[in-house]
Amino acid sequence: MRDLSASNRLRIGRYSEQNRIYLLTTNTARRQPVFSDIELGRLVASQFRVAEAMGFANSLAWVVMPDHFHWLIELKRGSRSELMQRTKSLSTKAVNLSTGRKTSLWQSGFHDRALRREEDLVKLARYIVANPLRAGLVQKLGDYPLWDAILGCADIELLPFASRLAPTLDIRRL
């Protein structure tokens, strides 16, 4: 058997369940802060929308940080591994096309966690989108453009600023 990364070894024997909620996280290669460039972060966010439009997942909350992303999804079709492979591949192509990069964008593998139905999704969505605040990137969440949530985050001091944010934020969904 070939050597597998720790995250891939953890998935041996596990399966992806349709309509189950998962928190997916992955890091950039060597934790480079590629998405400090907001435009490049938007290219990743657009792949979340593509996955949703193609019926692979419903995005419940996500944030693109300078060197990683967190994505809370309801899996609709395929497996988590297929979804992440597709998202990472397409976002790599988009970023490389935009920047002329030739190197890997992402670390291999990803972290995933299946949520229990009784877990508080609103609390988790708030935790995810508050990452930029905890990291000290902004003072108000509304000042950070690379996040979205359809669950209970409308009161995190963002609405006056939201109309000026990038197309990554759809306040009608909050």
Where in the sequence are the language-model features?
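Short catalytic/metal-binding and nucleic-acid-binding patches
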Residues: 1-174
